[in-house]
């Protein structure tokens, strides 16, 4: 029997008087990649925000590993082995690559820290090559690798990725998605929010389509790729 890792149960959210999410329900099973696709302004990043408490859900529940975390503080949620790679990367630009990774592994024991950083360097050899370089001088693709690596330093059970392909060259996008596939093969549970619907659905076990704050469709990744409405709206026909 599949174990459910994360559930959004009829989650609504507001920015002031504007309702951004309307009774959104979805779930992610352990070991899955689940993707959420939708146009700009559909509410994808807002839904991720309700998991981390920004914004808080105005109604409904967010449940992680059987625990209702709807009203938890962000720091407490992160201690539950949840890590997020935010849209726009947000690396510490004046710190070196290795210092950025150290921030991600701040709570790790020293032996565990060395093990994690070695693993991240194996996933992203370029980070090892540039480990003493300041993050702000790196390319967008390298910064995205660093943002993912930093999140992985906390040894998460659930990894949240918000638009990891945004603004990147096609060859770098493929490298990022290849790494996401590797993480799934190693048993990590991944919630992928992505505008690049074609790449995301090829990778995903299951997917959801969000429009104007409503889930309008859900199915396997392959089925959504073949869906005529999805192809017309998000895959260029």
Swiss-Prot record:
Pfam families per UniProt: ABC_tran
Nucleotide-binding as UniProt keyword: yes
Positions bound to ATP: 38-45
Stored SMART domains: AAA
GO molecular function: ATP binding; ATP hydrolysis activity; branched-chain amino acid transmembrane transporter activity
Keywords recorded for this protein, A-Z: Amino-acid transport, ATP-binding, Nucleotide-binding, Transport
Protein name: High-affinity branched-chain amino acid transport ATP-binding protein LivF
Annotated source species: Salmonella typhimurium (strain LT2 / SGSC1412 / ATCC 700720)
Recorded name of the encoding gene: livF
